[in-house]
């Protein structure tokens, strides 16, 4: 019997999330359109935005949907003077003005968390960084 132990990288989809995706895929409409189908699509998106915001203690306006991690990193980091670790994905390091090395245990020391981009858990090594400060 096999056991999947790479949850740090990717975890199986929860059945509730799968059902929500299936339900959402039945809604056809451009959320920017004013017709009934468009309004239904927009309502679906806005309800999802509010659920996510509530789950993390934010407001709906703070939630931005993107196509993936690379686009998200660009949105968050472009135009900023950011320090990151050499362990980050290229989607992050390509925006960093300086790159920090890790110690022999894979831990990165961050001196200025407000100007830093550092993943908490590395998806390849599973190493958890010890920092808890930062801007959310």
What does each model-identified segment do?
Residues 1-136:
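Pyridoxal 5′-phosphate
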